[in-house]
Amino acid sequence: MTTSAPPPETIGEPAQTPQPGMEAGPRKTLRVAAVGDLHVGETTTGGYRDLFERVGDEADVLCLCGDLTNYGKTPEVENLLADLKLCRIPMVGVLGNHEHECGQPEEVSRMLSDAGVRMLNGQAFEIEGVGFAGGKGFLGGFGRYMLSSFGETSVKTFVQAAVEDANAIENSIRMLRTERSVVLLHYSPVVDTVIGEPPEIHAFLGSSRMAETIDRYDNVSLVVHGHAHRGQPEGATHRGVPVYNVALPVLKTLGDKPYRVFDV
């Protein structure tokens, strides 16, 4: 049985939707910047002031794709927020695995939310007619090498966590009634963008389950993620939805900018 999802929070001018999935009026391009894997530490101060000051000149929205800190410690988040407060545009974000290391991901999420970042974990937001959905995602492998729920209880528990994360992402996409949407993740939904990492660890870098979820929806314009520091900058789902790895180490191979900007 399918239940209707609550409408997403709208930021800025609300998009008029006379029928599900269609916007009224002229189509306006939204400039979406994205970056992940800043890995701010306890001794990192002022390292990203330029990023947050500059991004508002080139983009309308900033997506933060997780691993913003090294261990999810409160002093690390405070150092991040000291720079992040300089950002002049709306921000949407997800946590990464590093934010879970100290066992207080809820506190990290709260601190970021209090600083104005719209945190995605099964939620959805709409900014000037473009939807934003997603979550951290999970690992488990890709294609025929994806781990299946078979054998030991511990393996089944692991796979169930991946399934639940994919379901949360699907719920957030389902909330949106925009014809254009951006999905934010930390883990990769496709193998394309993790190539370059040792093949032995590909299963720990993402899961095809997320791509399968994304491909069920026609209104997803692009996907951004982080996590794979030595991966490739671009890939696509089976249906051709563009997927971009915006981990900062990957962005550094493309040029000087500490973020990437997309027209949506």
Regions found by a protein language model. Name each.
Residues 115, 130-178, 203-208:
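Binuclear metal-dependent hydrolase catalytic cores centered on His/Asp/Glu-rich metal-binding motifs
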Residues 1-90, 100-103, 155, 159, ...:
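N-terminal active-site segment of His-dependent metallophosphoesterases
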Residues 102, 108-140:
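Hydrophobic alpha-helical segments and helix pairs
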Residues 2-29, 126, 208-221, 229-264:
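Binuclear metal-dependent phosphoesterase catalytic core
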Residues 29-39, 129-141, 182-184, 242-248:
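Active-site-proximal beta-strand elements of phosphoester/diester hydrolases
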